[in-house]
């Protein structure tokens, strides 16, 4: 008997029709999010009404919402993070939760290095000046010999580290869950404070559910540090980041994730902040692979 599945990521199937075509082979009732945005918490219960299976995005699946979805049996996430899902509730109630950790690695790593190069080489300002017919030349910075501190050294963190090393950067990392004996010895494991003190560039790739960079951490950093975050919005205290960017203690930043999305905060007023709308995984190959894996994960779990 064919069953109902809900698909909540608003971009699902836009890059390739293959994931949706595969679902149609097994489900005759497919509910798609056509709003173009994340489903708000107030609408999740209605959207999930009477379904056993979901291809999930970043919608709120806390216990207060899951408790109103007694039919739900499988949540298959398009993406890595599971912060939006109450995993204790799903475990206690025999709801399977799956994710797609592998496909995003290359895309997020590429985007991180793109941002690091753009900020280090002052690409944004050169482009802006020339479009204003200002022929301004200034000396920028190379990644060669720069100290890179990576917070979180899983799949993405390690790939980012390798990319930086190709440019001659010196890479150290902090990750309490990774044993250094399992990591290439070109990377140095350090304590969190040590990494902050020596970094020219800090790149966050952590699964921590805590704030990582606040006032105290910024005070430890070198002047002109570059901050990169494609991990979690709450990993950086936004007010502290704003103040340090404005004072030029931090030279610049790239932020792809925010506490509240869509983002409308004060960082948009700063020229030294590159802000992107949570699109590090938005390459054609990555989106298709993530969606296909999410579909296959769901089918395997049924």
Model-predicted segments: where are they?
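Glycine-rich Rossmann-fold phosphate-binding loop(s) that bind the pyrophosphate
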Residues: 153-154
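Phosphate-binding beta-alpha-beta segment of Rossmann-like dinucleotide-binding domains, i.e.
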Residues: 93-147, 159-162, 166
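Phosphate-coordination loops involved in phosphoryl transfer and adenosine-cofactor binding
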Residues: 2, 72, 144-147, 224
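N-terminal Rossmann-like NAD(P) cofactor-binding module of classical short-chain dehydrogenase/reductase
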Residues: 55, 76, 203
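A short helix->loop->beta-strand "cap" motif at the edges of active sites that frequently abuts
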Residues: 69-74, 93-95, 169, 223-225, ...
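C-terminal helix-to-coil terminal segments
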Residues: 2-4, 14-15, 19, 91, ...
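N-terminal glycine-/charge-rich "phosphate-binding" loop or analogous flexible N-terminal tail
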Residues: 1-51, 172
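Rossmann-like adenosine-cofactor binding region
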Residues: 63-66, 177-266
């Amino acid at each position: 008997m064919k069953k109902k599945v809900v698909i909540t990521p608003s971009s699902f199937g836009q890059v390739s029709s293959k994931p949706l075509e595969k679902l149609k082979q097994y489900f005759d009732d497919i509910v798609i999010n056509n709003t173009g945005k994340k489903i708000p918490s107030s609408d999740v219960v209605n959207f999930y009404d009477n379904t056993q299976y979901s291809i999930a995005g970043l919608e709120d699946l806390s216990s207060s919402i899951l408790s109103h979805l007694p039919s739900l049996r499988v949540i298959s996430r398009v993406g890595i993070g599971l912060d939006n899902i109450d995993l204790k509730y799903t475990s206690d109630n025999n709801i399977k939760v799956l994710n797609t950790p592998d496909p995003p690695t290359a895309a997020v790593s590429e985007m991180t290095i793109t941002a690091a190069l753009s900020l280090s080489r002052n690409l944004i300002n050169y482009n802006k000046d020339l479009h204003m017919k200002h022929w301004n030349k200034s000396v920028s910075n190379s990644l060669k010999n720069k100290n890179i501190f990576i917070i979180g050294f899983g799949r993405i963190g390690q790939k980012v580290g390798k990319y930086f090393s190709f440019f001659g950067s010196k890479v150290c990392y902090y990750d309490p869950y990774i044993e250094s004996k399992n990591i290439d010895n070109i990377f140095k494991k350090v304590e969190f404070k040590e990494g902050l003190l020596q970094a020219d560039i800090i790149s966050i790739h952590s699964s921590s559910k805590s704030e990582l960079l606040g006032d105290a951490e910024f005070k430890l950093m070198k002047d002109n540090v570059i901050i990169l975050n494609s991990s979690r919005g709450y990993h950086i205290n936004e007010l502290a980041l704003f103040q340090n960017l404005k004072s030029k203690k931090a030279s610049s930043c790239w932020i792809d994730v925010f506490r509240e999305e869509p983002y409308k905060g004060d960082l948009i007023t700063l020229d030294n902040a590159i802000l992107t709308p949570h699109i590090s995984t938005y390459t054609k190959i990555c989106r298709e692979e993530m969606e296909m894996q999410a579909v296959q994960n769901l089918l395997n779990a049924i």
